[in-house]
Curated annotation (Swiss-Prot):
Descriptive protein name: Holliday junction branch migration complex subunit RuvB
Enzyme class: hydrolase
Subunit structure: Homohexamer. Forms an RuvA(8)-RuvB(12)-Holliday junction (HJ) complex. HJ DNA is sandwiched between 2 RuvA tetramers; dsDNA enters through RuvA and exits via RuvB. An RuvB hexamer assembles on each DNA strand where it exits the tetramer. Each RuvB hexamer is contacted by two RuvA subunits (via domain III) on 2 adjacent RuvB subunits; this complex drives branch migration. In the full resolvosome a probable DNA-RuvA(4)-RuvB(12)-RuvC(2) complex forms which resolves the HJ.
Gene (UniProt): ruvB
Catalysed reactions, as listed in the record: ATP + H2O = ADP + phosphate + H(+)
Main location: cytoplasm
Annotated source species: Yersinia pestis bv. Antiqua (strain Angola)
Length: 334
């Protein structure tokens, strides 16, 4: 089992990027949730426009699927400038980054996704570009090689990462604006899925929106994916409208329960409860019991279960909490 196989994966699956682009908010006034981020960015953007300056460099971090790319697009739209998009793994050589930087117009936004995966050589090029709007490049090879400086137009670098701790200090310190995106509450996800349904021309009742939102693991990308799958169910098994009952039947059929857990989440929790008496159980034993690799458990399955308080990670191993027992209606033996 890999993350991309799961309906409730926060990673991008197949052609979702193009679909999400169609329903993505374009301006801060359309942006739902993250009130602290929205308020701060409104002020920073308005101040930069009043001064006629490029917006300061922005670092956006947080779990996948929370809208880092969406926020980068909104910032460029609000500033009225072009957005150039790339990612850390794509920028393999210093020349790749230099080509992008030299093609920027004044105040343009350069968005680098997965910025924590930049190679050290490419990262070194970024330092003077971010700080002084200058590009240091080498011309020629061997003894005849020489360094020249090119002036760059003022620009805004927006870096996005799910692993802010993996950034080097010199790179992290060059971002004047740092924004952390948090998991969304159900109420915000209800607004998001209602807006998405409207963009897609779907009839979605408040009860249907609530069922989708509460099972979305606090992640808009999952909300929108579930909406598309429930739409399919509603068109085939109902009259096309998505109400609470239709949404519940569709999501139950898709094996997404009221907590947003899928088959693999439940399999892991029940293994700890039934096979290991609630734990503690070592990671290798747990991996063998459910037929998964330990890396899959650590990186894919565990994080959300731990965050929601269903699993505890202790020095002796994994323990199922009272929440886990209650979820399955199992009485915990003392």
């Amino acid at each position: 089992m890999i993350e991309a196989d799961r309906l409730i994966s926060a990673a991008v699956i197949n052609d979702e990027e193009s679909i999400d682009r169609a329903i993505r908010p374009k301006l801060l006034t359309e942006y739902v949730g993250q009130p602290h981020v929205r308020e701060q960015m409104e002020i920073f953007i308005q101040a930069a426009k009043q001064r006629g300056d490029a917006l300061d460099h922005v670092l956006i971090f947080g779990p996948p699927g929370l809208g880092k790319t969406t926020l980068a697009n909104i910032i460029a739209n609000e500033m009225g400038v072009n957005l150039r998009t790339t990612s850390g793994p794509v920028l393999e050589k210093a020349g790749d980054l230099a080509a992008m930087l030299t093609n920027l117009e004044p105040h343009d936004v350069l968005f680098i996704d997965e910025i924590h995966r930049l190679s050290p050589v490419v990262e070194e090029i970024l330092y003077p570009a971010m700080e002084d709007y200058q590009l240091d490049i080498m011309i020629g090879e061997g003894p005849a090689a020489r360094s020249i400086k090119l002036d760059l137009p003022p620009f805004t670098l927006i870096g996005a990462t799910t692993r802010a701790g993996s950034l080097t200090s010199p790179l992290r310190d060059r971002f004047g604006i740092v924004q952390r995106l948090e998991f969304y509450p159900v109420a915000d996800l209800e607004h998001i899925v209602s807006r998405s349904a409207k963009c897609l021309g779907l009839e979605l009742t408040p009860e249907g929106a609530h069922q989708l939102a509460r099972r979305s693991r606090g992640t808009p990308r999952i909300t929108n994916r579930l909406l598309r799958r429930v739409r399919d169910f509603a068109e085939v098994r109902a009259d096309g409208a998505i109400n609470g009952e239709v949404a519940m039947k569709a999501l139950d059929m898709l094996n997404v329960d009221a907590e947003g857990f899928d088959f693999m989440d439940r399999k892991l929790l029940l293994a700890v409860i039934d096979k290991f008496m609630g734990g503690p159980v070592g990671l290798d034993n747990l991996a063998a019991a459910i037929g998964e690799e330990r890396e899959t458990i650590e990186d894919v399955l565990e994080p959300y279960l731990i965050q929601q308080g269903f699993i505890q990670r202790t020095p002796r191993g994994r323990i199922a909490t009272n929440h886990a027992y209650k979820h399955f209606g199992i009485t915990r033996e003392e």
